[in-house]
Regions:
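Cell-envelope/extracellular polymer assembly enzymes that use nucleotide-activated donors
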Residues: 8-10, 38
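Short, acidic, metal-binding catalytic loop of nucleotide-sugar glycosyltransferases
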Residues: 27-36
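Conserved short acidic donor-positioning loop in nucleotide-sugar-dependent glycosyltransferases
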Residues: 29, 44-45, 57, 105
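Short beta-strand/loop segment that forms part of the nucleotide-sugar
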Residues: 36-45, 67-69
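A conserved acidic beta->alpha catalytic loop
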Residues: 43-52, 72, 107
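Conserved donor nucleotide-binding strand/loop of the catalytic core
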Residues: 51-83, 87-95
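Short beta-strand-to-loop acidic/aromatic patch adjacent to the donor-nucleotide binding site
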Residues: 88, 96-108
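Conserved donor NDP-sugar-binding/catalytic core segment of glycosyltransferases
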Residues: 108-138
Length: 138
């Protein structure tokens, strides 16, 4: 077993019009017991307050990088999100990481989420991909 603290992961988050949720996502990533080495947030042309909320939430944090893609308005379900992820992934070329995460910005993670995920990858070398469950509070 390797040290969990030595495990490095990078996160790419395509985001569009998530003003309702993005602040909670930012807080939950900042509160992780094992933080990512880099978090790339790609705003895919939001028309709401998402860019402002992101800017306020991550200002001055050197391991978080944000950028915006302005599109022509045509969105293909799933395809534009993949394109935004690819743009973010290219910005990780200078980053050393063991795992890459695609994280939506409408989720809230418990503080030990990535620590637990990394522990499971460490315990079972055959694991190659992981996903979380969905729980909605009413």
């Amino acid at each position: 077993m390797t040290s969990l603290a030595a495990c490095r992961y990078a996160v790419v988050s395509p985001v569009k019009d998530e003003e309702k949720y993005v602040e909670r996502t930012i807080r939950s990533v900042l509160g992780q017991t094992i933080r990512p080495v880099r978090w790339i947030i790609v705003d895919d042309g939001s028309k709401d307050r998402t860019p402002e909320i992101i800017k306020q939430g991550v200002s001055g944090i050197d391991w978080i990088q944000c950028l915006r893609i302005d599109r022509d308005g045509n969105r293909e379900l799933g395809i534009t999100e993949i394109k935004a992820f690819t743009v973010g992934h290219k910005l990780l070329e200078d980053v050393e990481y063991d795992f890459i995460v695609k994280l939506d910005c409408d989720v809230e993670l418990p503080p030990t989420y990535w620590e637990e995920m990394l522990r499971r990858f460490d315990e079972k070398a055959a694991l190659g991909i992981a996903s979380g469950g969905f729980f909605e509070e009413h």
